[in-house]
Structures are given as C-alpha cells and as structure tokens.
Curated annotation (Swiss-Prot):
Postsynaptic neurotoxin. Expressed by the venom gland. Residues 1-22 form the signal peptide. It comes from Cyriopagopus hainanus. InterPro entries: Hwtx-2-like (IPR012625). One of its GO terms (cellular component) is extracellular region. Pfam families: Toxin_20 (PF08089). This is U4-theraphotoxin-Hhn1o. Belongs to the neurotoxin 12 (Hwtx-2) family. 02 (Hwtx-2) subfamily. PROSITE patterns: HWTX_2 (PS60022).
C-alpha cells in the first residue's frame, strides 16, 4: 500500500515536471520566432530548475538507502535541484 502511494505520487510529480518543461519549450520557440537575442534565451535557460527526484527500487537489497536520480542532458544536481550547466 505504502509503495503504491509513493509510486503514484512520483508519477504525478514527473507528469507535472514534464508539462512545465513542454510549456517552457513552447514559450522559447515563440520567443525565437519573434527574433529574441540568444543572450536573453540563455537567461531563460538559467532560470529553469527542476527538483531532483529520488528513485527507489521497489525491491531493495538489504538496508541500502535510496539514491538520488542523477540529472542528465546538460543539467547538474545542486541543493536538491537540477540546474542547467
């Protein structure tokens, strides 16, 4: 029961993060159509922060702690947030 609740909450959080990222990409594409300078687009990238999610395997081996999911694709984890590098 507890694992199911955690899985549902994790999926909901991932869905919200992906929706937010899609909206930002759409906004960036509209900004590029208007002819926004690259320096302003870089500022938009710097403001993008996503919470680092904690990934736990359902079947743990012994008493090992859950490990934080690593940020990928030009992002690094800092203060429990994924920050654009």
């Amino acid at each position: 029961m507890k694992v199911t609740l955690i899985a549902i909450l994790t999926c909901a959080a991932v869905l919200v993060l992906h929706t937010t990222a899609a909206e930002e990409l759409e906004a960036e594409s509209q900004l590029m159509e208007v002819g926004m300078p690259d320096t302003e687009l870089a500022a938009v990238d710097e403001e993008r922060h996503f919470e680092c999610s904690v990934s736990c395997e359902i079947e743990k081996e012994g008493n090992k702690d859950c490990k934080k999911k690593k940020c990928k694709g030009g992002w690094k984890c800092k203060f429990n947030m994924c920050v654009k590098v």
